[in-house]
A protein has these predicted regions:
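Cleavable N-terminal export/targeting peptides
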Residues: 1-44
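Short glycine/proline- and aromatic-enriched beta-strand/turn motifs that initiate or cap beta-hairpins
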Residues: 31-84, 246
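A generic hydrophobic-segment detector
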Residues: 33, 160-173, 187-192, 205
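Outer-membrane beta-barrel proteins
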Residues: 33-41, 96-98, 144-150, 166, ...
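Gram-negative (and chloroplast) outer-membrane scaffold detector with strong preference
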Residues: 44-48, 56, 60, 91-170, ...
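Residues that define the transmembrane beta-barrel architecture of outer-membrane proteins
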Residues: 46-50, 82-86, 134-140, 154, ...
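Flexible, solvent-exposed loop segments that connect beta-strands
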Residues: 64-79, 111-135, 168-183, 218-232
Length: 246
């Protein structure tokens, strides 16, 4: 048995070493292409650019308690927890000048899940529970992009703009939902971000980090829902790290 476990550990170690070697080889090969002179020299002068974007997000709700929360002694704690999700988008970039671009995402899907944690006290016994709010959001962001001068095969940029979100799975219209926290379908957010362009021979690789802050109250409050009536306003917050290939 010990020999089998030892062989398994050796096998896993060999696999990790092989994967690491492949990753190092690929990364060194890619970055060597960045040092071979200007790639895609006419890329930035084209009127339009198109790309595919995939991202990873961390999101949570910023909320305020309703006065009824202080009047009750059963629900003693309400918290919003960070959770992860993914983004898939199609990028359309319109050149406005040497340093400015208008960026649109005609198709931008965000898959996320928000979690509320509750602490309830009944007859001296405290219980903890979670309420999850899953969403598939169709977003319509509009960003103004300001770029630095290109240095060989590298460029840095910042973005700022607005985004409208439409939740395809909103539960605001559901009835008899004692266990639900009802959320409205639409939200309007402001966004800022920072990104980097790496120019390769046949494509541009763009990592980007972006912050989103919702402006509208998402909470569709219902006096009859005990997990909802202790909350007043709910605003969305999200940070996204994404990779775009143009």
């Amino acid at each position: 048995m010990q020999n089998i476990e030892f062989r398994d550990k050796q096998y896993l170690l060999r696999r990790k070493i092989i994967v690491l070697c492949i990753a190092v080889f690929c990364s060194s090969n890619l970055f060597s292409q960045l040092r071979q002179g200007p790639n895609l020299p006419d890329h930035d002068t084209k009127p339009y650019h198109f790309g595919i974007n995939i991202g990873f997000n961390k999101s949570h709700f910023l909320f305020s308690h309703h006065p009824i929360f202080l009047q009750r002694d059963t629900i003693t704690v309400v918290e919003s927890v960070n959770n992860s999700g993914i983004n898939l988008a199609w990028l359309v970039d319109k050149r406005l000048g040497n340093h400015f671009n208008l960026r649109l995402h005609p198709l931008d899907l965000t898959f996320s899940e928000k979690i509320f944690q509750y602490s309830e006290n009944y007859s001296g016994d405290t219980t903890f529970l979670e309420k999850k709010v899953s969403s598939i959001t169709l977003a319509f962001p509009v960003h103004l992009k300001f770029s630095s001068d290109r240095i060989n095969n590298f460029k840095v940029y910042t973005i700022a703009g607005f985004k409208y979100d439409y939740d395809l799975t909103s539960n605001a219209g559901k009835k008899n939902a004692e266990e639900l926290i009802k959320l409205k379908k639409g939200d309007f957010s402001v966004e800022v971000g920072l990104g980097f362009h790496f120019y390769f021979p046949v494509f541009v690789l763009t990592p980007e980090i972006k912050l989103s802050s919702g402006l509208l109250n998402l909470h569709s409050r219902d006096e009859n829902l005990r997990y909802s009536n202790v909350i007043d306003k709910i605003n969305s917050k999200m940070i996204t790290f994404s990779i775009t290939v143009e």
